[in-house]
Amino acid sequence: MYYNPFSPQCYYYVTVPMYNDGRSVYWTIPNEMEKVHRGADLRSSYEDRNLLLKDYGPKPFVVNINRATKQNNTFRTALWTGKHFQVTLMSLGIGEDIGLEIHPNVDQFLRIEQGRGIVKMGKSKDHLNFQRNVYDDSAIVVPAGTWHNVINTGNTPLKLYSIYAPPNHPFGTVHETKADAVAAED
């Protein structure tokens, strides 16, 4: 018999389907096992390629968000813009911040995928009484009407994605640098 790393250790204890769709519940070896694992190569080749970073909304979309976020090298790129929310990717250089800001009618969710930093939040720009260290896999929730800033304190770029509800930037937004983002706000 040939070595197959995906085959069960004992053929008597295979996972039996819950519903019978006309096939035998016991797989014949090796023909049926080949069919089960045929898609594994397709999945890995899909994940290895670089994604074209552009706005894919409002069409249905699936992405490896971790990989897309780490691939992004712009200050801000809209990845998906719909009617009710928006996903943007951000990359902050060493010592860079997103800038102290407030979204009066927009809730925001941010997730750190790489790097470390500090998030500051508060009811007024002069009183940011909420401060936390953030790092890989940290989630940040910013309620509407809250002043906030994220600062990269690490020695690598801080890579994160942000979800705005409702959308906060125009469809297709790409800001190469923070200066571009500030100019677009004016």
Curated annotation (Swiss-Prot):
GO terms for molecular function: ATP binding. This is Uncharacterized protein YrkC. CDD domains: cupin_Bh2720-like (cd02223). Pfam families: Cupin_2 (PF07883). Keywords: ATP-binding, Nucleotide-binding. The keyword ATP-binding applies. It comes from Bacillus subtilis (strain 168). The keyword ATP-binding applies.
